[in-house]
Amino acid sequence: MKISIIVGGKFHAFNLAEQINKKKYLQQIITSYPKSYLKKYGVNKNKIYSIILKEILLKIFNKINFLNHIFDYNYLLCEYFDNKASDNINYDKVDILVGWSGFSRKCFIKAKKFNCIKILERGSSHIKFQHKILTDEYKSLGIKPNVPSSQMIKKEIEEYDLADFICVPSQYVKETFIKYGIKKDKIIKIPYGVDLKEFCVVESKKRKDNKFRIISTGSISVRKGSHYLLEAFKELSLPNSELIFVGSFDPDFKKIIKRYSNIKNIRFIKKQKQELLRNFYNDSDIFVICSIEEGLAMVQAQAMACGLPVICTTNTGGSEIIDDNINGYIIPIKDTQSLKDRIKKLYNDRRKLKQMSKSAYEKANNELSWEKYGDRMLNTYRGLLKTKKNI
């Protein structure tokens, strides 16, 4: 079995490549990251093709805030990567071609001439569902929507059709695909894992204070529902508490932040390297994520591995890894009252908080490693190849 991966970025592709490579099944990975970045994942340079210009241009364009409202540079960069990648895949040596959504249309078209299985990785909901739910949320806030363009929607829909299978991380995502006409037997559902060496309880680390600390990591944005957490925290006004966000701001969200600038016990910390992030988890009591739309936010498993109970919305995909009322709480999207109730419950009941923290840690360590994820993926790939041979 030989597997190749196409990914215009990082996502969880490098974790997947690491697990496939350990079993000697990795043929090739094409990415926009430099070859040196995959060294920590144990992938040999001769198995990597790097299209680094895509990543360089993306970083430059992202710094020019208004640019995306003038033209869809993200789509153009995806097209550039896709075209370049499609010319550098060893199609005749591949049994399974795994491509990330938005980067794989041309690759899959060329792959049709060869006898390989095409699997599309989609980490978020169906792009039409994503577009609608986010457009509605932006409009409700009076902000110009920052959503997938019509060009990107068309590209991804074509990828859905070209793929033999679509791999998603949660039941929530799977249901959005079914809603938009994708057959159930075309969808594979496998939740992501977490690096248990990188994210863990640091026993030697002592808390600097006894504040009840809520943490949220990842982008601070409309999509992540950060405004619902801000509003809930403001309304609760809990004594000796603190809310910290660790991550980068979406430019559009800065308008919303101004409404909460007078609250002293809210901190915004810039995006951190993965190896430093665990220190912030270890210095907190609970993790909260209020996403309007997601796939399976990997920060949830990170927080659990560091011993934090998670409060999440249904649309984070968290129900795949969180047991409601045992190691976290799952609430409806946009429900500030439910969010306040769950936060207050853990604030008032420290015994319950301790029990849930222990359960979260155990769940992550027993079930959520990348090794277990890799085993599930490889078993799925083997099953698909076996079925193909029997047809």
Regions found by a protein language model. Give the residues of each.
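Acceptor-binding helix/loop patch of EC 2.4 sugar-transfer enzymes
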Residues: 41, 59-72, 114-155
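Carbohydrate-associated surface elements
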Residues: 172, 193
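Conserved donor-binding/catalytic core segment of Leloir-type glycosyltransferases
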Residues: 206-224, 230-235, 244-246
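Nucleotide-activated donor-binding/catalytic signature segment of Leloir-type glycosyltransferases, i.e.
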Residues: 254-275
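Short alpha-helical donor nucleotide-sugar binding micro-motif in glycosyltransferases
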Residues: 271-272, 279-284
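Aromatic "clamp/platform" in nucleotide-sugar-dependent glycosyltransferases that forms part
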Residues: 292
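Short hydrophobic beta-strand element within catalytic cores of glycosyltransferases
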Residues: 309-312
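Conserved acidic donor-binding segment of nucleotide-sugar-dependent glycosyltransferases
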Residues: 324-325, 329-336, 345-350
